[in-house]
UniProtKB/Swiss-Prot annotation:
Protein name, entry field: Uncharacterized protein YicS
Organism placement in taxonomy: Bacteria, Pseudomonadati, Pseudomonadota, Gammaproteobacteria, Enterobacterales
Entries under InterPro entries matching the protein: YicS_fam
Length: 97
């Protein structure tokens, strides 16, 4: 009886961890979302000079407001909501370049 009780408790403790474990492809999905957002932002905020992608990304992400709007865009992508996606990207302020 004790053995069954301990086994049941162990299963109940371990089960949520299995259920909420990240998919091995979740980082790939996040990278794809990030690339999509950066590609669309580059169309909206075209740099005048020759900036590397990394330097351009740092300039865009320097503003806390832009970081929030980009997070909103990522959530919109996850929810497959194109209207909110473009609305969030429209709020991003292009830095002086």
């Amino acid at each position: 009886m004790k053995r069954k009780t301990l086994l049941l408790i162990a299963a109940l403790v371990a089960l949520p961890g299995v259920t909420y474990a990240d998919s091995p492809f979740s980082s790939l999905q996040s990278a794809h979302e990030k690339n999509t957002i950066l590609k669309d932002l580059r169309k909206m905020c075209t740099p005048k000079g020759a900036l590397t992608d990394e330097a351009w990304e740092k300039k865009i992400m320097a503003s806390e407001g832009n970081q929030q709007h980009i997070r909103e865009a990522m959530i919109a992508i996850e929810r497959n909501n194109q209207h909110n996606y473009w609305q969030a990207l429209g709020k991003v302020e292009c830095p002086e370049m």
